[in-house]
Amino acid sequence: MAANLNIAIAAGGTAGHVNPALALAEELRRRGHTVRFYGESRRLEGTLVPEAGFDFTPVHVTGFDRERPWTLITALMHLARAEGRIVRDFKRDPSLRPDVVIGFGAYIELPLVRAAAKLGIPYALHEQNSVPGLANKQTAKGAALIAIAQPSVSEVFEKHGAPASAIKFTGNPVRASVLAGDRARGRAALDVPDGATLLVAFGGSLGAHHLNERLISLKRDLLARDDVYVLHSTGADDYDDTVRALALTTEEAARYRVRPYIDDMGDVLAAADLVLSRAGASS
């Protein structure tokens, strides 16, 4: 890869999109390239990206509900407005114009990828899931590269016009901080004794309602042993309801911790003796 490329990345909505994008961005930065992110400031990327030290340009777009087809009109209006703004920014300020654009799926990538296509800027896509999303399928035909995490996805993109030569099986990038997790540091941060058993339960950044319900039903059994500690990540939407349903006493809360999201996943996984999760793009 040429030195000092200016790279724009669009990723957002869930950690399954954002964290693989950050993993790639951190490696690109380590190699001397400049990376700018585009995403929704009010969603997860609006927090995680600046925390990782990357420039962040907020873009407002909305998805649409297939059961309410009239929401498509609003979604298309927001898309056109965001795409137009990006095109104008790239034309007005050469320092913002990227050498390459990378989309990590979800509707947030559409204005950036479409702007790149309009201006003749090469773009690449990354698909984390076993079932490609609508945004990646719609933009697959013009992509210079499509990186996939599941080999079976290749056929789907070929049906949407992508040449087989552009599709590469890469897997999902993992952030260095996850691989560098430290058990002692994680347990100290969670205040879990060395000899205790730590169960970590999470359903991805959005949570998993069924998993949360199951953990609630198991609370008494889990805390019956004095040497068992639990870290339960509920997802933001389920957090308040889960906290109310658990109704933890002060004594119970010392061993059963509830969070909406796990920021320090590397240390948490290293600290855990058992992880209870569900299959997702990254989790």
Predicted regions and their residues:
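A short helix/loop element that forms part of the nucleotide-sugar donor recognition site in Leloir-type
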Residues: 71-73, 179-191
